Design a protein with these regions (language model features):
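Structural beta-strand segments of beta-rich domains
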Residues: 50-52
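Signature of extracytoplasmic/envelope-associated structural regions
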Residues: 1-44, 55, 59-87, 91-93, ...
């Protein structure tokens, strides 16, 4: 008999435009339900909406699948759509199984909400799937299936024999983790830190390499209406374009389809936008010398900069388990939405690969594809919803070699540390799920939001001491830095000078690629690489570095280092970072 096997399971992820708004669409041939209901939105609805206000809810029922927006395919779509289940209806307000991922405009009298009956083929449409990224080479995953707080209650009475009288359900907690995955690229690194913006030098401002877009774009948008005239740069399928050039909201996408005209129509992007963009220019990725677009076979370097933000973006996870007989109709799919990656560790040790782990990820809720429970009267399983089954052929499996510890470099207080044996960098946002009073339908009792608290960084380093001669020169040592406590004032003036701390740089390099540039991840502490005295300016400080006498030779020290912030820069051949 067919069974579910660990080596036939995959976990993929994707950034959400709004908390809980998992990203996917529905194909054009998703059938409207017979004479099913349809209506139009009454007012604009932002991404992250948990309910819809419509002009007429007549004909809709709890449990119905509804399509919000319009059908799409590669030749006719001009806006985003998505499918959600109806959880409750009050008047003309429809409550949804999960928040929306996209902005949906007022219908204005034109129907843009439809009752639909998705087929198996509709839910295996590779063109509609976006939750298809792999964090790295992982082996095990703690999935965030709900933890049910069911408690027995003791009431006054004479027949319970000291046992509880009745059990009641409390809150639901969704917490998971992915430990120790090998870093194949830097896409997993930004989530406990903040935003990522991408750029390349292969753009310029000549007319032939620019194209306007007619209207402002929102975070999450997949479709871009082209402005300008037919004499402007044509955007063909596979053309890469940059939005927000020269800013910290710059991002690069690839055109996957062109609707109506490559010069005056609408293009569809390979992934949703991560930032809002005012109407303006987008720049074509091309060779600066010839003002021509890059050939699809040409590899060019992209730089991805990760910087701190107060609010963290949320992610969706999709768990796809294919049975051993490979019958896709029996696949077991679960999706977790609204996840905040609150803590992460980046580590490496001699002889191994550099790894990362998402140590604590809290989610808002989940959906799955196990529709009915076989009881005397079949009931719909709680949290069931129609969704895309993320198939293997659509998953963006990295083809890169991993980053190796032996190809890295660590510098501290201006010195390259030659004898690092291991390092472990930890980030914690101390996030807390909050359970506010809110109208939740069905059996939902999960968090209403997840809030970040104080952010904390630390770095643990194990290193062998330098040669004895170096310890008696002007070269600064770990022991000296520990005693200085980051204060480099004179013996008589150190109080007024104040603490400064020192800079740390961790560089991970992956050999030369075909074009001659190196894939590289650079972690800079503090974020600007320039520790200084004063608030929000300090660098790193050694808290402990005991020079114990052990059996290790040469002499080995384990240092614990505190620092206040960092930035990460990644250079590789990936145009898109989520």
């Amino acid at each position: 008999m067919a069974v579910y096997r660990a080596d036939q399971a995959q976990v993929t992820f994707m950034t959400e435009p709004a908390a809980g708004g998992y990203v996917e669409q529905a194909p054009k041939d998703t059938a409207k339900t017979g004479s099913g209901a349809d209506t139009d939105l009454d007012g604009n609805h932002e991404a992250g909406s948990t309910s819809l206000t419509v002009t007429d809810s007549t004909g809709f029922s709890v449990g119905d699948a509804i399509l919000i927006g319009y059908w799409h395919d590669s030749t006719t779509a001009t806006n985003e759509n998505e499918i959600r289940q109806i959880e409750h209806i009050t008047g003309n307000v429809i409550y949804l199984s999960a928040p929306t991922a996209f902005y949906h405009a007022d219908g204005g009298g034109t129907d843009n909400v439809f009752e639909v009956t998705p087929t198996t083929a509709n839910l295996q449409d590779a063109d509609s799937q976006y939750i298809n990224l792999i964090p790295g080479a992982y082996e095990t995953v703690d999935v965030p299936d709900p933890e049910m707080a069911i408690e027995g209650r003791w009431f006054l009475g004479t027949t319970s024999k000291r046992a509880f009288y009745a059990a009641y359900s409390g809150q639901q907690t969704y917490a998971g983790s992915i430990g120790g995955f090998a870093l194949l690229d830097g896409k997993a690194l930004r989530y406990p830190i903040g935003k990522v913006y991408s750029t390349t030098t292969f753009t310029n401002d000549v007319t032939a390499m620019k194209r306007t877009f007619a209207a402002a774009l929102k975070k999450g948008d997949l479709y871009v209406a082209l402005g300008g005239t037919s004499s402007d740069a044509a955007i063909a399928v596979t053309t890469k374009v940059m939005f927000g050039r020269g800013s910290e909201t710059s991002e690069i996408r690839q055109s996957t389809s062109v609707l109506a005209s490559a010069s005056a129509g609408t293009i569809r992007l390979d992934y949703p936008l991560q930032f809002d963009h005012a109407a303006g220019d987008m720049h074509v990725i091309g060779t600066a010398a010839s003002n021509t677009t890059i050939a699809t076979t040409q590899t060019i370097p992209y730089t991805h900069s990760i910087k701190e933000t107060v609010d963290l973006d949320s992610v969706s996870w999709h768990v796809h388990m294919l049975p051993s007989d490979e019958t896709r109709a029996n696949a077991f799919d679960r999706r977790y939405y609204g996840g905040k990656i609150g803590s992460m560790t980046i580590s490496g040790e001699e002889g191994g690969m550099v790894t990362a782990s998402w140590d604590g990820v809290n989610f808002l809720g989940m959906i799955h594809n196990q529709k009915t429970v076989d009881l005397s009267t079949d009931i719909t399983t709680p949290f069931f919803a129609d969704m895309q089954s993320i198939i293997n052929s659509k998953v963006d499996f990295p083809t890169n070699e991993p980053y190796y510890f032996s190809q890295g470099e660590v510098t501290m207080f201006g010195q390259t540390i030659a004898r690092i044996r291991s390092f472990s960098l930890s980030i914690s946002n101390n996030e807390e799920p909050r359970y506010y009073i809110k109208k939740q339908m069905g059996r939902k009792r999960g968090p209403t939001e997840i809030r970040e608290q104080r952010r904390e960084y630390s770095l643990a380093v194990t290193l062998a001491l330098p040669d004895a001669a170096a310890a008696n020169t002007a070269q600064r040592t770990l022991f000296q830095e520990m005693l200085l406590e980051g204060n480099y004032g004179s013996a008589t003036d150190f109080i007024r000078t104040g603490k400064k701390g020192f800079d740390v740089s961790i560089t991970l390099t992956r050999g030369n690629v075909v074009t001659g540039f190196e894939d590289k991840i650079t972690i800079t502490i503090p974020d600007d690489g320039a520790a200084a005295t004063g608030g929000n300016q300090q660098g790193a400080f050694i808290r402990t570095a005991p020079h114990n006498i052990t059996e290790d030779n040469p002499f080995q020290v384990e240092a614990d280092i505190l620092f206040r912030n960092l930035s990460i820069t990644v250079q590789d051949a990936e145009h898109y970072y989520p």
